[in-house]
C-alpha cells in the first residue's frame, strides 16, 4: 500500500509541474524538459547505491529515509510560486529523485523477501500492479484537486490552464501538493506499522 501511495504522489508531480514550468513560468519546452530530467537522473544514480546499501544495512533505515525525503519534497513544492528561483525547483526535484531511489529498492526487497520462493512471481506482479495503480490514482486525483482548487479561486468552473492567470494555477498547485504531502505521510505511517508487525 505504501508503494501505491508513493507512486500516486510521484504522478502528482508529473501532471502539475509541466504546467508550472511551461505555462506559469513561460519556460521553453526544451528547458522545462531538461529541468524535469533531474528526477530520473537522481533515480539512475541513487537506485544502485540504494540496492547496495540495502544488502549491507537492511531496508529499514533506507525506507524511512526515502519517505522522509519525499515528504520534504512535497512541502517544498507547496511553496513554489512565480518568483521561486529555478535552483529551488531543481533542489526539490533532486530530493524527490533521491527519496524515490532510497525508498523503492528496499521496499521491493521487503516485498520479495516476505513470500516463499514459489510465490516470487506473484510478489513481482503485485509490485507492478501497485506501481500502475499508483500512476492511475495519481493522474486522476491530481487533476481533480488541481482544477477544483483553481475553480474555487477563480469563482467559476475551470477545466484547463487559464492564460494570463498564473496566480489561479498556483492556488490549485499548492492544494494538489498538500494532498501529495498527506499521501507521503500516510505511506510513512503505514510503513511504521508494517515494521512493527514484522518485528513482533
Regions from the language model: what does each represent?
Residues 151-162:
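Peri-membrane helix termini and adjoining interfacial loops of integral membrane proteins
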Residues 1-149, 173-191:
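12-transmembrane solute porter fold
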Residues 163-174:
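Membrane-interface segments at the starts/ends of alpha-helical transmembrane spans
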Residues 161-164, 194-200:
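Intrinsic disorder in cytosolic terminal tails and internal cytosolic loops
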Amino acid at each position: 500500500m505504501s508503494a501505491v501511495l508513493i507512486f500516486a504522489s510521484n504522478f502528482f508531480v508529473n501532471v502539475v509541474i509541466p504546467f508550472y514550468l511551461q505555462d506559469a513560468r513561460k519556460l521553453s519546452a526544451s528547458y522545462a524538459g531538461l529541468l524535469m530530467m533531474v528526477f530520473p537522473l537522481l533515480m539512475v544514480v541513487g537506485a544502485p547505491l540504494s540496492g547496495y546499501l540495502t544488502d549491507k544495512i537492511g531496508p529499514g533505515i533506507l525506507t524511512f529515509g526515502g519517505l522522509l525525503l519525499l515528504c520534504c519534497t512535497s512541502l517544498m513544492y507547496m511553496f513554489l510560486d512565480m518568483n521561486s528561483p529555478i535552483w529551488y525547483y531543481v533542489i526539490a526535484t533532486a530530493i524527490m529523485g533521491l527519496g524515490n531511489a532510497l525508498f523503492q529498492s528496499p521496499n521491493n526487497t521487503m516485498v520479495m523477501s516476505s513470500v516463499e520462493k514459489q510465490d516470487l512471481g506473484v510478489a513481482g506482479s503485485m509490485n507492478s500492479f501497485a506501481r500502475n495503480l499508483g500512476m492511475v490514482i495519481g493522474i486522476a486525483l491530481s487533476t481533480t484537486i488541481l482544477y477544483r482548487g483553481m475553480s474555487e479561486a477563480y469563482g467559476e468552473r475551470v477545466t484547463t490552464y487559464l492564460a494570463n492567470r498564473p496566480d489561479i494555477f498556483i492556488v490549485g498547485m499548492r492544494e494538489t501538493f498538500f494532498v501529495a504531502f498527506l499521501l507521503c505521510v500516510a505511506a510513512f505511517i503505514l510503513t511504521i506499522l508494517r515494521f512493527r508487525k514484522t518485528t513482533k
